[in-house]
Amino acid sequence: MKLPSLLSLGVAASTTIVAAVPDQKPIGDTIEDVHLGKFLIELGPGDTRWVTEEEKWGLRRDGRRFFDITAEAEQNVFPKTFAQTTVTFPSELQNVAHVKKLASSLSKNRLQTFLTKFTSFHTRYYKSESGRQSAIWLFEQIEKIIQESSATGARVEKFEHPWGQFSIIATIPGQTNKTVVVGAHQDSINLLMPSILPAPGADDDGSGTATILEALRILLKSEAVAQGKAPNTVEFHWYSAEEAGLLGSQAVFAQYKQDNRDVKSMLQQDMTGYSKGTMNAGHVDSVGIITDFVDEGLTNFITKVVTGYCGISYVLTKCGYACSDHASASRYGYPSAFVIESKFEYSSKLIHTTRDEVSSLDFDHMLQHAKMTLGLVYELAFADL
């Protein structure tokens, strides 16, 4: 099938497009393969291939991650890369007392209550009706949090896609358009039969969705943030279609690049609730800070945030190419980072099955991710970036 165009890249107007990836196979003048029911995926820099939808899911079942870049082929703008934005992050934490006071109001009960409902949708597969309904419900929860706060100018908007499930963007305006982003993906998938079988997706990525939602709720309790007094704008993103090749986040950041948005940082929270793998391996509970395909400066600052605001430590780990939505931000030149629940090899093996349920999650561990998210967003909202 032919995937509808997602990305309007404005190539002629862009001044940040640089040389294509070396040794990348060029796309010809036609994209006939798309009309033959195939999709163009990128499994690594310079590693592209046309695959069927079933072959996409087969690669996912084998643990392979990729960008689905079919839309770029349709726009005839592939291959390309973007110049990376250079940002100097703070050398030290500046708001410890205030953030810790805010963090004391983070609620495990709210995390669990939210996830109990969120995982009750049959699946949050991005092309399913229940995936659309889950997005509507999530949007309503975000809308309610903003309405119940004293925030001035805060808003939540739908970012529509050609498929049924939209992405969601909540914005807290600051004094400038410099923007700090945290994200999670709202979709789930059962890789055995994506369109049919249940996919509760409690950890992947209901946990990240709940984590950043709770961080948003508490951040809005800061009068300075809620009244728009922070120097920088803050956005919370919940992406559609991550499991299908980072489709939702690619569309969002492609639009941001076209609009010349000044995104200073992006943190992804994907899988924040499973600690049994670490414990069963005989290790101390910790969060996993990803070190490959991320921005080094932002990642180094996150280690300071974890040390300053979390009750557990961190381990450094790798997850590979295009392993979550932060990769889309990086693809379009924005500094990005990713924090996961553990060292990558100890992360949940229940994901993408019917067994990825709330009962497998550690809400004390998830609360640490919420503290880290809140701390990072608050620090960067008030930083000179």
Curated annotation (Swiss-Prot):
It is found in: Secreted. Glycans are attached at residue 177. It is an enzyme of class 3 (hydrolase). InterPro entries: M28_fam, Peptidase_M28. Disulfide bonds join 319-323. Its main location: secreted. Belongs to the peptidase M28 family. M28E subfamily. This is Leucine aminopeptidase 1. Residues 21-87 form a propeptide. Monomer. The gene is LAP1. Coiled coil: none annotated.
